[in-house]
Amino acid sequence: MANKREFPLEKTRNIGIVAHIDAGKTTTTERILYYTGKIHKIGETHDGASQMDWMEQEQERGITITSAATTAQWKENRINIIDTPGHVDFTVEVERSLRVLDGAVVVLDAQSGVEPQTENVWRQATTYGVPRIVFVNKMDKIGANFDYSVSTIKDRLQANPLPVQMPIGAEDSFEGVIDLIEMKADLYDEDELGSKWDTVDVPDEYKEDAQARRDEMIEALADVNEDIMDKYLEGEEISNDEIRAAIRQATLNLDVFPVFAGSAFKNKGVQMMLDGVNDYLPSPLDVKPYKATDPETGEEIELKADDSAPFAGLAFKIATDPFVGRLTFFRVYRGTLEAGSYVLNATKGKRERVGRLLQMHSNHRNEIPEVFSGDIAAAIGLKNTTTGDSLTDPKTPLILESMEFPDPVIQVSVEPKSKADQDKMDVALQKLAEEDPTFKAETNPETGETLIAGMGELHLDIIVDRMKREFNVEATVGEPQVAYRETFTKQVSAQGKFVRQSGGKGQYGDVWIEFTPNEEGKGFEFEDAIVGGVVPREYIPSVEQGLKEAMQNGVLAGYPLIDVKAKLYDGSYHDVDSSEAAFKVAASLALRNAAPKGGAVILEPIMKVEIIAPEDNLGDVMGHVTARRGRVEGMEARGNAQVVNAFVPLAEMFGYATVLRSATQGRGTFTMTMDHYEPVPKSIQDEIIKKNGGNAE
């Protein structure tokens, strides 16, 4: 091996910092970089000077859009941090990062506790089996309440929080924290930017409460750890090291989630939380081996973090950097990779050369000669690689489990302000779509207009903004439109026969296909049930491809057809005239013939909406929901506000921010996430079909 590994694997942590928007996540990351010696001057998000938020729009809006990956060192550990956005429109970034992380720090706002986006991220982290610790931030804020925040972890996330600290004071009088393991208090010196604190005995007025909380912590550990349980029941002394080891084990098993308290803005509690990252979150050796498939044999292989094995990694993000061009962020799961060497993009079956390797500190780059197992780095020079691709040693191709991304729910038309910019705009949109799998750009074949689709209004605003800043293309944006879908509600069989035999080589393809509604979210499933070669083997992929392409254009109003099973069960062919192209056309004809009898309906995205408004405006808010074809699912009091949970069609939510602001004098807020699809009412379906010039029944 050319270079020596700087940090052993067990001293490496790959973590994400995740939170609801405004819980203080970027500030927390800033402080981590400051204390780990990476930054000399702290940048505040409210000044637009934060180190991690490196795109101009992020600094202007004070929110984090792309996950910057940064490497830092704390005590004897290397910590690779991925900062992730908290706004729902950018959930894909979070999903992407959780895929390549081993652990996460979930930041909560001490006044609000668990918020809607926290629930989404928590659910995603549970899906990927990511161990977490929780940092209850903003303890200095008015209304900060540590115990309330901890209770929301139980109530809203159905998770098992394990407070390992308690705060000393709150709001203006928040002075520090008590470590419930060591039973010592850390009091901060206001003037020293949090780099100095005194560790003292627990103040008398807190002793009883702290002891009771320590006992609760040990009881909770005894429930999930037999050794602790035995000692606890026998009344034996349990050492602090044993407690820490038990917390680590329980955290890795997702049995508990250690909770810390602090205020990143006021520089309090961040270092203790970093100790928690080292003490409780996994190294690449602690996580379950990653699964990959051998493309030749289909055999499943476990990738263990091991520098001596052949290289395997996953590209999880593409970013365009103004100085070095296209950056491919990737995680190394096995082996090592040197700059200048070749890798195989096993997903696309193409060899690529890695020009240079960089490790990013926010958007500063350090060039490195080699990366090792468990590392996160960025490569320059990979031209064909996109998000979710597997990169491996050319001699041992492997396909790593890829990522699944949600479909866009909203679309707008865009046209360049000057016609001369059309080509420039096409290039810009293509580059932006490469970076972001939830963003799509397409041209409407009938009207010739360019449509862009994404996860929400903010998402598309930012895309249009980036076109202007990074590619100098100014665009006019149309009204937002809903990305509807279509599906079948009945089982139906239909024939598709395509015959052309007039002079020269003819065309012949004939298929019988049975279409059945599929479960929601299952997408398109194709089954080959041909017996006796009535449709030859080599034409079957063309039938599937023909269906997929035809489904993109729908059967009612031109929207993609989803959640349908298609079973090819009969057909015929011609020795000379049959071709792949003819069977492709035949498949699309079968779909068209099935449509009238398949009970086709238009589906609309239904959003899960959480509206927070003052008690006095509750009546207005309920009225807003019902007027928008929504249904209220539940209500709860949160502090002195009311929280209304509802399901509302996306089509009815455009412009709602303005309505809510004026009804509540600016005090109401709402968040929404895509939840599921539902058929639109018949009257609205007919309108949509008429507007799109489709086939109303």
From Swiss-Prot:
Gene3D superfamilies: 3.30.230.10, 3.30.70.240, Elongation Factor G (Translational Gtpase), domain 3, P-loop containing nucleotide triphosphate hydrolases, Translation factors. One of its GO terms (cellular component) is cytoplasm. Pfam families: EF-G_D2 (PF22042), EFG_C (PF00679), EFG_III (PF14492), EFG_IV (PF03764), GTP_EFTU (PF00009). Keywords: Cytoplasm, Elongation factor, GTP-binding, Nucleotide-binding, Protein biosynthesis. GO terms for molecular function: GTP binding; GTPase activity; translation elongation factor activity. Residues 10-285 form the tr-type G domain. GTP binds at residues 19-26, 83-87, 137-140. InterPro entries: EF-G-like_DII (IPR053905), EFG_II (IPR041095), EFG_III (IPR009022), EFG_III/V (IPR035647), EFG_IV (IPR047872), EFG_V (IPR035649), EFG_V-like (IPR000640), G_TR_CS (IPR031157). The keyword Aminoacyl-tRNA synthetase does not apply. It is found in: Cytoplasm. Signal peptide: none annotated. It comes from the Bacteria. GO terms for biological process: ribosome disassembly. Belongs to the TRAFAC class translation factor GTPase superfamily. Classic translation factor GTPase family. EF-G/EF-2 subfamily. PANTHER family: RIBOSOME-RELEASING FACTOR 2, MITOCHONDRIAL (PTHR43261:SF1), TRANSLATION ELONGATION FACTOR G-RELATED (PTHR43261). Catalyzes the GTP-dependent ribosomal translocation step during translation elongation. During this step, the ribosome changes from the pre-translocational (PRE) to the post-translocational (POST) state as the newly formed A-site-bound peptidyl-tRNA and P-site-bound deacylated tRNA move to the P and E sites, respectively. Catalyzes the coordinated movement of the two tRNA molecules, the mRNA and conformational changes in the ribosome. This is Elongation factor G. The gene is fusA.
